[in-house]
UniProtKB/Swiss-Prot annotation:
Role description: Involved in the biosynthesis of lipid A, a phosphorylated glycolipid that anchors the lipopolysaccharide to the outer membrane of the cell.
Name of the protein described by the UniProt record: Acyl-[acyl-carrier-protein]--UDP-N-acetylglucosamine O-acyltransferase
Keyword terms, alphabetized: Acyltransferase, Cytoplasm, Lipid A biosynthesis, Lipid biosynthesis, Lipid metabolism, Repeat, Transferase
Disulfide topology: none
Top-level taxonomy: Bacteria, Pseudomonadati, Chlamydiota, Chlamydiia, Chlamydiales
One Gene Ontology cellular component: membrane
Family annotation (HAMAP family): LpxA (MF_00387)
Catalysed transformations (reactions): a (3R)-hydroxyacyl-[ACP] + UDP-N-acetyl-alpha-D-glucosamine = a UDP-3-O-[(3R)-3-hydroxyacyl]-N-acetyl-alpha-D-glucosamine + holo-[ACP]
UniProt similarity note: Belongs to the transferase hexapeptide repeat family. LpxA subfamily.
Gene name as annotated: lpxA
Enzyme Commission code: 2.3.1.129
């Protein structure tokens, strides 16, 4: 049975699932759906054609499903979908989409920290972390298990690959390949996200292949896309390397980030890589 505080405003038509908890002074508009076991804490505001998945918690003063911050929006019917077991923390803003029938989508088990902003037409995968004040412009795509540090700014239409780790205060203008780590404004790649992949129990051989593939691609003197093809021939039997290369080869409105932190790469010898990965 749902628990709804008497000061909460629930418009007629809103769909409230089993065992939902709605705290004081929450506003839930008529076209919102809260699935089972959702918790909405005080002063949160949920609007639009928004669906919140099972077990997700919306923290105080978060705002979800509002009109997109896009002058092209003319009142079209658009959507927000948030998956299961997410944490949408204090003052986070997730706006609705812009074009008719389109959706802002957030996957399962995501953590959206305070003051983070997810703009119109964004797509976020599963197990993603947006740290405090991370800001996604419109049409950004974030892959599974990606982590964005505090106060990261992401340009519209950028893609951030799965398992990427973006350091705090970074400015992202181009697509960030999966499995990589980097930071800075302007952004620079610093190699493969070895620690993150190890924590997710990616096999040693796969991690080592990703490291070698990254260096082969980014240290090449010739054409970047020729290096991708050569690396695909050498390591293409490893799914993660194939994913990395296909991400870089796929259509992009912003282009692939090619700037690297040369010092960070030079500090890694082959022996050191092995020790870091296996430890």
């Amino acid at each position: 049975m749902a628990s709804i505080h008497p000061t909460a405003i629930i418009e007629p038509g809103a769909k409230i699932g089993k065992d939902v908890v709605i705290e004081p002074y929450v506003v839930i508009k008529a076209t919102v759906t809260l699935c089972d076991n959702v918790v909405v804490k005080s002063y949160a505001y949920i609007d639009g054609n928004t669906t919140i998945g099972k077990g997700t918690t919306i923290w105080p003063s978060a705002m979800i499903g509002n009109k997109p911050q896009d002058l092209k929006y003319q009142g079209e019917k658009t959507y927000v979908t948030i998956g299961e077991n997410c944490e949408i923390r204090e003052f986070a803003i997730i706006t609705s989409s812009t074009f008719e029938g389109t959706t802002v989508s957030i996957g399962n088990n995501c953590l959206i920290m305070p003051w983070a902003h997810v703009a119109h037409n964004c797509t976020i995968g599963n197990n993603v972390v947006l740290s405090n004040h991370a800001q996604l412009a419109g049409h950004v795509q974030v892959g599974d298990y990606a982590i964005l540090g505090g106060m990261v700014g992401v340009h519209q239409f950028v893609r951030i690959g799965a398992h990427a780790m973006v350091g705090a205060l970074s400015g992202i203008r181009r697509d960030v390949p999966p499995y990589t780590i980097g930071s800075g404004n302007p952004y620079q790649l610093a190699g493969i996200n070895k620690v993150g992949l190890q924590r997710r129990q990616v096999p040693f051989a796969t991690r080592l292949a990703l490291i070698k593939a990254f260096k082969k691609i980014y240290r090449a003197d010739g054409c970047f896309f020729e290096s991708l093809e050569e690396t695909l021939e050498e390591y293409g039997d490893i799914p993660e390397v194939k994913n990395f290369i296909e991400f870089c080869q796929s259509p992009s409105k912003r282009g692939i980030e090619r700037s690297i932190d040369k010092q960070a790469l030079e500090e890694e010898s082959a022996d050191k890589e092995g020790v870091l990965i296996e430890s």
